[in-house]
């Protein structure tokens, strides 16, 4: 792949059981191959891919001296797995474990200094896997999105009936078991509905326009996966991450701020809360000023934690 500002970005693959995972490995400028570096596995948002905001953070943290790995989730992007577009929390968590596996095989990585970083839903997955992934020595999220809230409450949609959705999921599973094509719904609308909440407009602008649109980011999901997402609670065991440190980074204007607060309040010390004034959920994806502040905090956090 291309290089930028002395950053070497290389496409790599690594296994998750029988699934081939696709990633981009970023290494620091002027890397000394005789040395070992701290490393980060970077998980992407729901509907996203490694070339978007996860790759942005991976590249910027490599510029700060880290070996970083941004990777596509199983069933998504350039990673393998069928059916395509599945969003399975258990598999997303296993993807992260396998990314750590891969990092431990690299001669340039100090295996005792590996951290996890997740953006949006990726933030919830790194927090969820960390209690039982002891190789992760420090964990951070940026603009965390709790998909359980969306699946159970329909947030940010104003009208939603969970029971009706579950009945529909059951009917769809029965139909698919009898041979019907797998149903996929838009995770990001192809057109912004009239009167849509601002965060939906932000999502559309990021994923569906030249701002960050990528041909491997389909921004759809398997409809029946909503049942799995309803069962997923990212902070169920979050207090067990301690004494390893965790960090939540969120914009003061992010509609999702309450999702990070729920995890932060349940987590044990050492934990940190870092707000970026004026930033919305998606400004922390690619806005240079907002991302710059987030990266500066991440550099400080991982610098003393790994």
List the predicted regions and their residue ranges.
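Short beta-strand/loop motif that positions the catalytic acidic residue
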Residues: 241-242, 248-250
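N-terminal cap/lid segment of alpha/beta-hydrolase-fold proteins
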Residues: 1-35
């Amino acid at each position: 792949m291309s290089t930028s500002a002395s950053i070497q970005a290389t496409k790599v693959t690594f296994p998750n059981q029988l699934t081939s995972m696709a990633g981009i490995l970023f290494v620091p400028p002027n890397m000394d191959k005789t040395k070992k570096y701290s490393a980060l596995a970077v998980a992407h948002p729901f509907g996203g891919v490694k070339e978007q905001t996860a790759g942005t953070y991976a590249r910027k943290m490599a510029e700060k001296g880290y070996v970083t790995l941004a990777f596509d989730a199983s069933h998504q992007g350039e990673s393998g797995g069928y059916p395509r577009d599945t969003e399975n929390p258990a598999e997303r968590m296993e993807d992260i474990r396998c990314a750590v596996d891969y990092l431990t095989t690299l001669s340039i990585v100090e295996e005792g200094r590996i951290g996890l970083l997740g953006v949006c839903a990726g933030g919830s997955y790194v927090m969820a896997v960390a209690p039982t992934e002891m190789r992760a020595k420090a964990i951070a999220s940026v603009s965390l999105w709790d998909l359980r809230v969306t699946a159970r409450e329909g947030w940010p949609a104003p009208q939603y009936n969970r029971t009706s959705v579950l009945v529909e999921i059951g009917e769809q599973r029965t139909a698919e078991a009898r041979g019907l094509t797998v149903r996929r719904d838009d995770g990001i609308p192809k057109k912004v509905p009239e009167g849509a909440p601002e965060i939906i407009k932000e999502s559309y602008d990021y994923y569906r326009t030249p701002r960050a649109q990528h041909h491997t980011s389909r921004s759809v999901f398997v409809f029946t996966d909503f049942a799995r997402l309803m069962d997923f609670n990212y902070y169920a065991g979050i207090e067990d991450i301690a004494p390893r440190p965790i960090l939540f980074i969120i914009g003061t204007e992010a509609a999702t701020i309450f999702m990070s607060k729920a995890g932060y309040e349940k987590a044990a010390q050492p934990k940190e809360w870092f707000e970026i004034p004026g930033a919305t959920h998606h400004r922390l994806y690619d806005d240079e000023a907002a991302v710059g502040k987030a990266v500066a905090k991440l550099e400080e956090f991982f610098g003393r934690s790994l």
